[in-house]
Amino acid sequence: MRYLRPLNSCLRGIRSGSSFQPLAQSLNTRIRYSSSFAKTDMESINTTERLAGLRELMKKNKVDIYIVPSEDSHSSEYIAACDARREFISGFSGSAGCAVVTLEKAALATDGRYFNQASRQLDNNWLLLKQGLQDVPTWQEWAAEQSENGKVVGVDPTIMSASDARKLTEKIKKRGGNDLVAVEENLVDLVWGDSRPSRPKEPVKVLARKFAGKDVKTKLEDLRKELLKKKSSGLIVSMLDEIAWLFNLRGNDIPYNPVFFSYASVTSSSATLYVDSSKLSDECTAHLNENGVSVRDYSKIFGDAEVLSQSLDAEDTKVKKFLVSSRASWALKRALGGDAKVDEVRSPIGDAKSVKNETELEGMRACHVRDGAALIEYFAWLEHQLVVEKVKMDEVTAADRLEQLRSKQKNFVGLSFDTISSTGPNAAVIHYKPEPGNCSIIDPNAVYLCDSGAQYFDGTTDTTRTLHFGEPTEMEKKAYTLVLKGNIALDVAIFPKGTSGFALDVLARQFLWEEGLDYRHGTGHGVGSFLNVHEGPIGIGTRIQYSEVPLAPGNVISNEPGYYEDGSFGIRIENIIMVKEIETKHQFGEKPYLGFEHVTMVPYCRKLIDETLLTRKEKHWLNEYHADIYSKTKDFFKGDELTMSWLEREIEPL
C-alpha cells in the first residue's frame, strides 16, 4: 500500500555489467519527473482552469458527466506519468481513486489510505468522497445521482474496465438515466495538451531461466490446458505483469514495476505479443521466436480483436468465446464482440503467477536476507546520525541513504516503490511521500516509520518498520505492541487448505479491536517475483474479493497491520510471508493444513515493545525470529562495529 512517484522510468539504478544495462542515472542522483502539473506531494494546486477546459470539451461532446479513473489502458495500479490523468485534473496524487466531473461540480473518491492526503491536496473545487464510510456514496452512486433527468455520462472506454462500465451503467439505469457513453478521444488528454508527458519507450529484456524458474513453452502449455478446461477459443491478455511473467520478459515503462506496454493473445495454436518492436533487442526477438511467439505492433490489438471476433462466427465448433480478465477494458471487450463472444474471468495467468515455483521462492528468501542487511545497516546509521552526531536530517536525505545501501546488494535492480520515510505526524499519512523542499526534519523524539522495498533479479521486497530514537510515550508503545501482536498472530496461524485471506484478516486486527482501535487499509497484498510489489488475486483484508481466492502453497503475501493517529503518529509493521503446507497431528476431513514462512529479516524496535502486553509464546516467537535474523545477516557486517552493535542490542532476548 503505497504511492507511486510519477517518473519516466522505474528501475533507476540497474547494475552495470548485468544482463540489464543502466536505464537511468546513477543512484547517487535522485531522479524526479517534473511535469507542468507536478507539485510537492502534500500541496494543493488550483484546478479551476483545468476543470473549465474539461467542461468546454464535455459540452462539445454532449456529455454532462465525465469519469476520470486512476488506471491506464491495462488497469494498472501504478501508472506511467503520461497516464496520470486523474492526478492532472484533480491535483490528488494517491494511487487509488476516481474523479467524477459534472458541468457544475467535481468529486474525488478514494479509500481510507488516502483520506488525509486527499484532504490536503484537493482545492476548493472538489468534493471528497471518503469511500467506505457510513452514508458516503460510492463514486458510481454519486455519478448516477448526478445523471438524473436524462444527463449523459461519458468515459474513455480504454481506461475503464468492462466490469466497472457495466456496474456504472446499472447504477445510472436505476436512476432513469441513459446508457454510459464511450467517448473515443480522452478529454483530459486534450486539456493537458503538449505538456502531457510522452509515453515511455524503454527497452525490454529477457529474464534468465535461473531467475524465472520455468520456461515460456511450459507456461504456454499450462495455459492452453486451462483454456481447454474452460472450453475457450483463446485468451486476450491486457495486464502488464501477466504478460511479463508469461513470456519471461521485463521492462521499464512504469515506475518501480518492471513491465512494458503490451497486449497478448494465446490460442490453442498461437501466441502473439503486441508491443512496440523497436523496444525488443535481438535477444528478445530470438527468445520469442524460440518459444513460438509472434510479434505484432502494440496498436494492432483492437483491429486484431475484431478479426478474432469474426473468426468465431466462421468456426465449426461449439467453442464460441474468448476469455479476458475481469479487469480488461471496456474498449477491448467491445472490439472482441461483447458479451456474446467474451467471458470475463479471473485470469488463469494471474492465478498461476501468484503461486511461485521453487526457484522463485528461493529467490525471495535470498533477496530478503540481502535486503534485510541493507535495512539493518540503514537503521543503525540513522540512529547514530540523529542521536550521536546530532545531525539535522530530512526524510528524503535518509531515504536516499537507504537506496544507496540497497544498491550495493547482489542482483539489485531498483526500488519497488517510492520509500515512505516519515517522522512524527507524517507517519499517520498512510501513503506519505516526502519531496525535496517539502519534507520534515526527522525528529529523534518522535516515531519514525519507514516503508520501503526493492527489485532484485531474484525477487521483490517490501518491508515496514517503525522506530523511535528517543523515549516513546506510553500510547506509542501500547499501539506498537498491539500491532506487533497482530503481526505475530498472523505469522503463526495454521489453517485448512481452502481458507482465504478474508477469513484471516481478523487475526491481525484482534488486539486492536479489543481496545476499540483499527486501521483503514488491508492487512496483506500479494507480492510479485521481480514484478509488481502489489500482486493479485490474493490478499488479506476485508475486501469481498479476498474471500473468493483461497491461499495456496507458493503464495507470497505481506503481513502489515498498523495504527494511526492523525496529526500525531503512525505505526505499521510489515513482513513478507510465504504460504506453505504444515504437518499437523490430525487432518480433519483429510484436508491439508497451511501456514506461513516469514522471509523478512529485520528486527522489531525493542524500545517500542511493551513486554507486559506480550504472552510467553509471543516472547518465545520474537526471540526465535531475532535469532534467525542474526544468524542470516551477521556476516554482512564483518568489521562494521556500529551496525553489529545496533543489531545485537535490538535482538537481545526478551
Curated annotation (Swiss-Prot):
Which of this chain's residues are annotated to bind Mn(2+) 2? D451, D462, E574
GO MF annotations, alphabetized? metal ion binding; metalloaminopeptidase activity
Positions bound to Mn(2+) 1: D462, E560, E574
Q: Which GO terms describe its cellular component?
A: cytoplasm
The superkingdom listed in its UniProt entry is Eukaryota
Q: How is the cofactor bound?
A: Binds 2 manganese ions per subunit.
Cofactors: Mn(2+)
Whether Plastid counts among this entry's keywords is: no
Q: Which GO terms describe its biological process?
A: proteolysis
Provide the E.C. number(s) assigned to this enzyme: 3.4.11.9
Q: Entry's CDD domains?
A: APP
The cross-references to Gene3D superfamilies, in alphabetical order and at most eight, read: Creatinase/methionine aminopeptidase superfamily, Creatinase/prolidase N-terminal domain
| Catalysis: reaction(s) | Release of any N-terminal amino acid, including proline, that is linked to proline, even from a dipeptide or tripeptide
One Pfam family cited in the UniProt record for this chain = Peptidase_M24
Q: Which SUPFAM superfamilies match?
A: Creatinase/aminopeptidase, Creatinase/prolidase N-terminal domain
- Keyword terms, alphabetized: Aminopeptidase, Hydrolase, Manganese, Metal-binding, Metalloprotease, Protease
Q: What does this protein do?
A: Catalyzes the removal of a penultimate prolyl residue from the N-termini of peptides.
Please give the family membership noted in the entry: Belongs to the peptidase M24B family.
Task: Please give the name of this protein.
Answer: Probable Xaa-Pro aminopeptidase P
The organism's lineage?
A: Eukaryota, Fungi, Dikarya, Ascomycota, Pezizomycotina
